[in-house]
Amino acid sequence: MLRPAFLLLASLFSTQLAQSVTLAEQAWVTVGTSGNPADKTGFGGVAYEFQIMKFEVTVREYAEFLDCVARQSDPHQLWVPAMGEHVITDLGQGGIRKDVPQCILREGVPGSWKYLPVPERKSCPVFFVSFFSALRYANWLHNGCQNGETESGAYDLTQGARVERSAVAKVWLPSEDEWYKAAYFQPEELGGPEGSYWRFPMCTEERPINADPGSEVTHAACFSRGFSGIAPVGSYPNAKAPCGALDMGGNVWEWIETSVFESKRVLRGGSSPHNWEKLQSNVRSNASPDRWYPDTGFRLARSAGN
Protein backbone atom coordinates (compact mmCIF):
# COMPACT_ATOMS: atom_id res chain seq x y z
CA MET A 1 0.00 0.00 0.00
CA LEU A 2 1.39 3.40 -0.97
CA ARG A 3 1.95 5.78 1.92
CA PRO A 4 0.40 9.28 1.87
CA ALA A 5 3.85 10.93 1.79
CA PHE A 6 4.80 8.92 -1.26
CA LEU A 7 1.52 9.79 -2.94
CA LEU A 8 2.12 13.48 -2.22
CA LEU A 9 5.62 13.34 -3.73
CA ALA A 10 4.26 11.49 -6.74
CA SER A 11 1.58 14.13 -7.17
CA LEU A 12 4.13 16.94 -6.94
CA PHE A 13 6.41 15.21 -9.44
CA SER A 14 3.48 14.71 -11.79
CA THR A 15 2.54 18.39 -11.53
CA GLN A 16 6.12 19.52 -12.17
CA LEU A 17 6.43 17.14 -15.11
CA ALA A 18 3.23 18.50 -16.63
CA GLN A 19 4.54 22.03 -16.23
CA SER A 20 7.85 21.06 -17.86
CA VAL A 21 6.01 19.57 -20.80
CA THR A 22 4.07 22.81 -21.20
CA LEU A 23 7.31 24.80 -21.34
CA ALA A 24 8.86 22.34 -23.76
CA GLU A 25 5.86 22.74 -26.05
CA GLN A 26 6.36 26.48 -26.29
CA ALA A 27 7.62 27.33 -29.77
CA TRP A 28 10.13 30.16 -30.08
CA VAL A 29 11.53 31.88 -33.15
CA THR A 30 14.76 33.85 -33.43
CA VAL A 31 14.88 37.52 -34.36
CA GLY A 32 18.36 38.12 -35.75
CA THR A 33 20.31 40.86 -37.57
CA SER A 34 21.62 42.57 -34.45
CA GLY A 35 22.07 46.33 -34.57
CA ASN A 36 19.53 46.99 -37.31
CA PRO A 37 18.37 50.59 -37.82
CA ALA A 38 14.93 51.68 -36.68
CA ASP A 39 12.08 52.12 -39.12
CA LYS A 40 10.95 55.59 -40.22
CA THR A 41 8.37 55.38 -37.41
CA GLY A 42 11.26 55.40 -34.94
CA PHE A 43 10.67 51.82 -33.78
CA GLY A 44 12.35 48.50 -34.45
CA GLY A 45 16.03 49.11 -33.80
CA VAL A 46 17.41 46.35 -31.55
CA ALA A 47 21.11 45.88 -30.81
CA TYR A 48 20.97 42.18 -29.92
CA GLU A 49 19.56 38.90 -31.13
CA PHE A 50 16.59 37.52 -29.18
CA GLN A 51 13.72 35.06 -29.44
CA ILE A 52 9.98 35.61 -29.30
CA MET A 53 7.11 33.17 -28.85
CA LYS A 54 5.81 31.90 -32.17
CA PHE A 55 2.28 32.09 -30.77
CA GLU A 56 0.51 34.12 -28.10
CA VAL A 57 0.06 32.50 -24.70
CA THR A 58 -3.04 30.31 -24.98
CA VAL A 59 -6.06 29.80 -22.76
CA ARG A 60 -4.80 26.30 -21.87
CA GLU A 61 -1.36 27.58 -20.89
CA TYR A 62 -2.76 30.39 -18.78
CA ALA A 63 -5.19 28.00 -17.05
CA GLU A 64 -2.21 25.82 -16.07
CA PHE A 65 -0.55 28.92 -14.64
CA LEU A 66 -3.66 29.71 -12.60
CA ASP A 67 -3.86 26.14 -11.34
CA CYS A 68 -0.31 26.48 -10.11
CA VAL A 69 -0.39 29.92 -8.47
CA ALA A 70 -4.02 30.76 -7.71
CA ARG A 71 -5.63 27.66 -6.22
CA GLN A 72 -5.39 28.84 -2.62
CA SER A 73 -6.13 32.51 -3.25
CA ASP A 74 -5.96 35.08 -6.02
CA PRO A 75 -5.08 38.46 -4.49
CA HIS A 76 -3.86 39.91 -7.80
CA GLN A 77 -6.92 39.02 -9.88
CA LEU A 78 -5.04 36.78 -12.25
CA TRP A 79 -8.47 35.31 -13.00
CA VAL A 80 -11.45 37.65 -13.34
CA PRO A 81 -15.14 36.69 -13.45
CA ALA A 82 -15.39 37.95 -17.04
CA MET A 83 -13.28 34.95 -18.11
CA GLY A 84 -16.13 32.65 -17.09
CA GLU A 85 -19.09 34.63 -18.41
CA HIS A 86 -20.43 34.50 -21.93
CA VAL A 87 -22.39 37.75 -22.17
CA ILE A 88 -20.93 40.71 -20.33
CA THR A 89 -23.20 43.69 -19.92
CA ASP A 90 -20.79 45.99 -18.11
CA LEU A 91 -17.04 45.49 -17.82
CA GLY A 92 -16.80 48.32 -15.35
CA GLN A 93 -14.42 50.10 -17.70
CA GLY A 94 -16.66 52.72 -19.19
CA GLY A 95 -18.31 50.67 -21.91
CA ILE A 96 -20.87 48.02 -22.76
CA ARG A 97 -19.65 44.83 -24.43
CA LYS A 98 -21.78 41.92 -25.58
CA ASP A 99 -21.20 38.49 -27.03
CA VAL A 100 -17.81 38.05 -25.40
CA PRO A 101 -17.04 34.33 -25.11
CA GLN A 102 -15.85 32.50 -22.03
CA CYS A 103 -12.27 31.31 -21.90
CA ILE A 104 -11.50 29.96 -18.40
CA LEU A 105 -13.97 28.70 -15.78
CA ARG A 106 -13.24 28.58 -12.06
CA GLU A 107 -14.75 25.88 -9.87
CA GLY A 108 -14.57 25.10 -6.17
CA VAL A 109 -13.96 27.35 -3.18
CA PRO A 110 -11.01 29.43 -1.97
CA GLY A 111 -8.24 27.05 -0.97
CA SER A 112 -9.13 24.49 -3.62
CA TRP A 113 -10.04 26.39 -6.75
CA LYS A 114 -9.70 24.63 -10.08
CA TYR A 115 -9.32 26.45 -13.40
CA LEU A 116 -10.77 24.86 -16.51
CA PRO A 117 -10.14 26.08 -20.04
CA VAL A 118 -13.33 26.21 -22.08
CA PRO A 119 -12.78 23.32 -24.56
CA GLU A 120 -13.53 25.26 -27.72
CA ARG A 121 -11.30 28.11 -26.55
CA LYS A 122 -8.30 26.28 -25.09
CA SER A 123 -6.14 26.85 -28.17
CA CYS A 124 -7.12 30.50 -28.52
CA PRO A 125 -4.93 33.28 -27.14
CA VAL A 126 -5.88 34.07 -23.57
CA PHE A 127 -7.75 37.35 -23.12
CA PHE A 128 -9.08 39.33 -20.16
CA VAL A 129 -5.53 39.53 -18.78
CA SER A 130 -4.00 42.75 -17.51
CA PHE A 131 -0.47 43.95 -18.17
CA PHE A 132 0.45 43.00 -14.61
CA SER A 133 -0.99 39.51 -15.08
CA ALA A 134 1.28 39.12 -18.11
CA LEU A 135 4.29 40.16 -16.00
CA ARG A 136 3.33 37.67 -13.29
CA TYR A 137 3.14 34.93 -15.92
CA ALA A 138 6.65 35.93 -17.03
CA ASN A 139 7.87 35.79 -13.42
CA TRP A 140 6.33 32.33 -13.02
CA LEU A 141 8.23 31.05 -16.07
CA HIS A 142 11.42 32.82 -14.98
CA ASN A 143 11.22 31.06 -11.61
CA GLY A 144 10.71 27.62 -13.11
CA CYS A 145 6.95 27.47 -12.57
CA GLN A 146 7.15 27.39 -8.78
CA ASN A 147 3.85 27.60 -6.92
CA GLY A 148 2.95 31.16 -5.98
CA GLU A 149 6.23 32.74 -7.13
CA THR A 150 4.87 35.64 -9.17
CA GLU A 151 6.06 38.83 -7.48
CA SER A 152 9.73 38.76 -8.41
CA GLY A 153 12.01 37.28 -11.03
CA ALA A 154 11.90 38.93 -14.44
CA TYR A 155 10.12 41.87 -12.80
CA ASP A 156 9.96 43.17 -9.22
CA LEU A 157 6.26 43.77 -8.62
CA THR A 158 6.68 44.89 -5.02
CA GLN A 159 7.68 48.44 -6.01
CA GLY A 160 4.41 49.75 -7.41
CA ALA A 161 3.38 50.50 -10.99
CA ARG A 162 6.78 51.61 -12.35
CA VAL A 163 8.16 48.16 -12.98
CA GLU A 164 11.22 47.53 -15.11
CA ARG A 165 12.74 44.39 -16.57
CA SER A 166 15.49 42.77 -14.53
CA ALA A 167 18.91 42.62 -16.17
CA VAL A 168 18.89 38.86 -15.53
CA ALA A 169 15.35 38.17 -16.78
CA LYS A 170 15.07 34.77 -18.46
CA VAL A 171 11.78 35.63 -20.16
CA TRP A 172 10.01 38.95 -20.47
CA LEU A 173 7.27 40.93 -22.15
CA PRO A 174 8.80 42.33 -25.35
CA SER A 175 9.62 46.01 -25.58
CA GLU A 176 8.01 47.97 -28.39
CA ASP A 177 11.24 47.89 -30.39
CA GLU A 178 11.57 44.11 -29.93
CA TRP A 179 7.96 43.42 -30.85
CA TYR A 180 8.07 45.81 -33.82
CA LYS A 181 11.23 44.26 -35.19
CA ALA A 182 9.83 40.73 -34.86
CA ALA A 183 6.62 41.77 -36.62
CA TYR A 184 7.86 43.96 -39.47
CA PHE A 185 11.63 43.82 -40.05
CA GLN A 186 13.18 41.94 -42.96
CA PRO A 187 16.41 43.20 -44.55
CA GLU A 188 16.13 44.16 -48.21
CA GLU A 189 18.96 41.79 -49.07
CA LEU A 190 16.97 38.93 -47.55
CA GLY A 191 13.79 39.62 -49.49
CA GLY A 192 12.39 42.51 -47.51
CA PRO A 193 10.86 45.67 -48.96
CA GLU A 194 12.62 48.96 -49.59
CA GLY A 195 13.63 50.25 -46.19
CA SER A 196 13.55 46.71 -44.71
CA TYR A 197 10.23 47.13 -42.86
CA TRP A 198 6.92 45.70 -44.05
CA ARG A 199 3.68 47.61 -43.65
CA PHE A 200 1.87 44.56 -42.22
CA PRO A 201 3.16 41.79 -39.93
CA MET A 202 2.91 38.98 -42.46
CA CYS A 203 5.60 40.10 -44.91
CA THR A 204 3.33 42.16 -47.12
CA GLU A 205 2.61 45.70 -48.24
CA GLU A 206 -0.78 44.51 -49.44
CA ARG A 207 -3.88 45.07 -47.34
CA PRO A 208 -4.66 41.84 -45.41
CA ILE A 209 -7.83 39.88 -46.06
CA ASN A 210 -10.28 38.85 -43.36
CA ALA A 211 -10.30 35.08 -43.87
CA ASP A 212 -11.77 32.16 -41.98
CA PRO A 213 -9.38 30.25 -39.69
CA GLY A 214 -7.44 27.68 -41.67
CA SER A 215 -6.91 29.92 -44.68
CA GLU A 216 -3.57 29.35 -46.40
CA VAL A 217 -3.45 32.85 -47.88
CA THR A 218 -0.16 34.52 -46.98
CA HIS A 219 -1.76 37.84 -46.06
CA ALA A 220 -4.81 36.52 -44.18
CA ALA A 221 -5.63 37.62 -40.64
CA CYS A 222 -8.39 37.66 -38.03
CA PHE A 223 -10.01 41.11 -37.91
CA SER A 224 -13.49 42.65 -38.23
CA ARG A 225 -14.94 39.46 -36.74
CA GLY A 226 -16.15 40.67 -33.34
CA PHE A 227 -15.11 39.47 -29.90
CA SER A 228 -16.49 35.99 -30.53
CA GLY A 229 -14.35 35.72 -33.67
CA ILE A 230 -11.05 35.25 -31.80
CA ALA A 231 -9.44 32.21 -33.42
CA PRO A 232 -7.05 29.48 -32.23
CA VAL A 233 -3.39 30.46 -32.45
CA GLY A 234 -1.74 29.52 -35.72
CA SER A 235 -5.01 29.61 -37.67
CA TYR A 236 -3.26 31.35 -40.58
CA PRO A 237 -0.14 29.19 -40.98
CA ASN A 238 1.22 30.94 -44.07
CA ALA A 239 0.73 34.49 -42.78
CA LYS A 240 4.08 34.65 -41.02
CA ALA A 241 6.02 37.60 -39.70
CA PRO A 242 9.59 37.84 -41.07
CA CYS A 243 10.94 35.97 -38.03
CA GLY A 244 8.40 33.17 -38.44
CA ALA A 245 6.01 34.23 -35.66
CA LEU A 246 2.29 33.93 -36.30
CA ASP A 247 -0.73 36.04 -35.36
CA MET A 248 1.19 39.27 -34.83
CA GLY A 249 -1.59 41.03 -36.71
CA GLY A 250 -5.22 40.66 -35.64
CA ASN A 251 -6.88 38.15 -33.29
CA VAL A 252 -5.89 39.90 -30.03
CA TRP A 253 -3.95 43.03 -29.17
CA GLU A 254 -0.70 42.24 -27.40
CA TRP A 255 0.62 43.90 -24.26
CA ILE A 256 4.00 45.58 -24.76
CA GLU A 257 6.48 46.29 -21.98
CA THR A 258 7.02 49.90 -23.10
CA SER A 259 5.23 52.66 -21.20
CA VAL A 260 3.57 55.72 -22.74
CA PHE A 261 1.86 58.79 -21.29
CA GLU A 262 3.52 57.94 -17.95
CA SER A 263 0.82 55.55 -16.70
CA LYS A 264 -0.19 53.60 -19.83
CA ARG A 265 1.36 50.61 -21.59
CA VAL A 266 1.57 50.12 -25.33
CA LEU A 267 -0.60 47.66 -27.26
CA ARG A 268 0.31 46.41 -30.74
CA GLY A 269 -1.12 44.26 -33.51
CA GLY A 270 -4.85 44.94 -33.67
CA SER A 271 -7.57 42.43 -32.81
CA SER A 272 -10.57 40.49 -34.04
CA PRO A 273 -13.13 43.24 -33.26
CA HIS A 274 -11.09 45.95 -35.02
CA ASN A 275 -10.49 46.60 -38.72
CA TRP A 276 -7.45 45.91 -40.90
CA GLU A 277 -5.96 49.36 -40.34
CA LYS A 278 -4.94 48.45 -36.78
CA LEU A 279 -2.49 45.85 -38.14
CA GLN A 280 -0.25 48.47 -39.74
CA SER A 281 3.23 49.25 -38.49
CA ASN A 282 2.37 52.91 -37.92
CA VAL A 283 -0.53 52.10 -35.59
CA ARG A 284 -0.08 51.69 -31.86
CA SER A 285 -2.55 51.79 -29.02
CA ASN A 286 -2.28 51.94 -25.25
CA ALA A 287 -4.22 50.94 -22.16
CA SER A 288 -4.18 51.09 -18.38
CA PRO A 289 -1.92 48.28 -17.13
CA ASP A 290 -4.25 47.25 -14.31
CA ARG A 291 -7.25 46.75 -16.58
CA TRP A 292 -8.28 43.69 -18.55
CA TYR A 293 -9.89 43.65 -21.97
CA PRO A 294 -11.86 41.09 -24.03
CA ASP A 295 -9.46 41.28 -26.99
CA THR A 296 -6.03 41.67 -25.39
CA GLY A 297 -3.43 38.99 -24.66
CA PHE A 298 0.35 38.65 -24.81
CA ARG A 299 3.41 36.71 -25.90
CA LEU A 300 6.85 36.69 -24.30
CA ALA A 301 10.45 37.10 -25.44
CA ARG A 302 13.76 35.67 -24.19
CA SER A 303 17.46 35.80 -25.00
CA ALA A 304 18.67 33.94 -28.06
CA GLY A 305 20.99 31.82 -25.94
CA ASN A 306 18.19 29.67 -24.51
List each model region and its residues:
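Short, polar loop/linker segments at the starts of domains and inter-domain junctions
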Residues: 37-53, 211-223, 244-246, 277-292
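Active-site-proximal beta-strands of protease catalytic cores
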Residues: 249-259
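Active-site microenvironments of metalloenzymes and redox enzymes
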Residues: 44-45, 51-211, 260-261
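Bacterial N-terminal signal peptides
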Residues: 4-15
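Bulky hydrophobic/aromatic "packing anchor" residues in well-ordered structure
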Residues: 31, 36, 52, 62, ...
